[in-house]
Regions:
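Register position in tetratricopeptide repeats
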Residues: 1-2, 18, 35-36, 52, ...
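Canonical positions in the second alpha-helix
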Residues: 14-15, 48-49
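Transmembrane beta-strand segments of Gram-negative outer membrane beta-barrel proteins
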Residues: 73-91, 109-118, 154
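Outer-membrane beta-barrel translocator/channel fold
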Residues: 90-101, 120-140, 157-182, 186-308
Length: 321
């Protein structure tokens, strides 16, 4: 079309009207609309086709491209540099009361190769009898999401703490491969060191479908006695270009998240549910809030309820590109 998408769109619409059962025509129309930056409208055109042909590979591939372009556009209209602050808590009351909080302050920047973030975390723990502990700990962390190719990207992170509660060292590496039909797969490993080495591997399968993103993820905790596992399902509903709500369900014996604190080593098995809401208010401000509940085993014969919550704010700096 040599970039003449406004002229090509009426012709594509006429083709769809004359041949409504011709799937390639709807795919073409959806792509032409997306190339003009109208991603929600383009996704709706493809959704119409998928409602009658849910396995149409061309439509699924087009929808994945539209979602990716929409995400790229949302990054372009936000400031490339930001400062960010966050807070989280995690608490239980058996076999003793424990209230763990983490306050975070950091900064991020979007480079040509991807995004990087550096942060300082301050953790504070309060426990009830018999120990009656009230103590704090600092952690210094850095993470990045480099884009290796158009089909591959990665996540790398490292954190260090010299205190008694956070792991001394925490590192992670995960690689993603995008596939046709809106699919992606990943594999990675998380490493922690308290007074011994801990390795947790992870694999995932992801799927974009219209305004939804689904993910199945497994974790493998490598121990001297063997390998323990856990499994998690994520369902995300996009409310706009970047806004979403996400539900996470999980069960198993391997932690699904970093060991934030040494007392997490008590966990033996858990089932959990989490809900997260992310809102990009404008090019300068974005906001995230989440809550979760776990029913976990901490000894051979004892279980407990566990509650968590988190909130984060990001303030952009500089001009959007």
């Amino acid at each position: 079309f040599e970039g003449k998408y406004p002229e090509a769109e009426p012709a594509a619409r006429l083709l769809v009207k004359q041949f409504p059962e011709y799937g390639d025509a709807r795919v073409l129309l959806g792509r032409i609309i997306a190339w003009q930056g109208r991603y929600d409208e383009a996704a709706a055109v493809i959704d119409t086709l998928l409602s009658s042909e849910p396995d149409n590979s061309d439509a699924l591939s087009a929808l994945a491209d539209i979602r990716r372009w929409s995400h790229d556009r949302s990054r372009q209209v936000t400031a490339p540099t930001d400062i960010r602050a966050g807070y989280m808590f995690d608490t239980f009351s058996e076999p003793y009361e424990r209230f763990w909080q983490v306050f975070t302050l950091g900064a991020g920047h979007r480079f040509s190769w991807g995004t990087a973030v550096a942060a300082v975390n301050y953790g504070h723990i309060n426990t009830g009898p018999p120990s009656g502990t009230s103590d704090g700990d600092f952690q210094f962390a850095a993470e990045a999401w480099p884009e290796l190719t158009r089909k591959n990207y990665a996540y790398v992170s490292y954190a260090y703490s010299n205190g008694p509660w956070f792991p001394r060292h925490r590192a992670a590496l995960e690689l993603w491969q995008t596939l046709p039909a809106g699919l992606a797969v990943s594999a990675g490993v998380n490493y922690y060191y308290f007074d011994h080495n801990i390795f947790i591997g992870t694999v995932s399968l992801e799927k974009y479908l219209a305004k939804y993103w689904f993910s199945g993820r497994a974790y493998f905790h490598f121990k001297d006695i063997g390998v323990t596992t856990s499994f998690f399902l994520n369902a995300r509903r996009y409310l706009g270009t970047a806004d979403y709500v996400q539900l996470t369900l999980g069960t198993g014996t391997a932690p699904d998240e970093p060991y934030d604190i040494i007392t997490d080593l008590e966990r033996q098995k858990a089932s959990s549910v989490r809900l997260t809401w992310f809102n990009q208010i404008n090019q300068w401000w974005s906001f995230r809030i989440g809550a979760g509940y776990s029913y976990e085993k901490y000894s051979a014969t004892s279980n407990r309820n566990r509650f968590e919550g988190n909130i984060g704010i990001i303030r952009g700096i500089g001009r959007a590109k």
